[in-house]
């Protein structure tokens, strides 16, 4: 994910146009916010559930609905 994002940033910068530079800048900011948000959510899930196992952490939608919404929003915006 990081390599793909930075490849797109580099491609935009290499166009040397205003659209490319502003798009690269926007993508860098968005990537930084999304990635740090996903790491924050992973830490919150670990602190509340006490495990990193996906088998143990099933049913998070029922247990933490707002956190599940944030997972969806950040994952979809990180694509």
UniProtKB/Swiss-Prot annotation:
It is a multi-pass membrane protein. Belongs to the complex I subunit 4 family. The keyword Kinase does not apply. One of its GO terms (biological process) is ATP synthesis coupled electron transport. The keyword Mitochondrion applies. It is found in: Mitochondrion membrane. Pfam families: Proton_antipo_M (PF00361). Core subunit of the mitochondrial membrane respiratory chain NADH dehydrogenase (Complex I) that is believed to belong to the minimal assembly required for catalysis. Complex I functions in the transfer of electrons from NADH to the respiratory chain. The immediate electron acceptor for the enzyme is believed to be ubiquinone. GO terms for cellular component: mitochondrial membrane. GO terms for molecular function: NADH dehydrogenase (ubiquinone) activity; ubiquinone binding. It catalyses: a ubiquinone + NADH + 5 H(+)(in) = a ubiquinol + NAD(+) + 4 H(+)(out). Its EC number is 7.1.1.2. Keywords: Electron transport, Membrane, Mitochondrion, NAD, Respiratory chain, Translocase, Transmembrane, Transmembrane helix, Transport, Ubiquinone. The chain crosses the membrane at residues 24-44, 54-74. This is NADH-ubiquinone oxidoreductase chain 4.
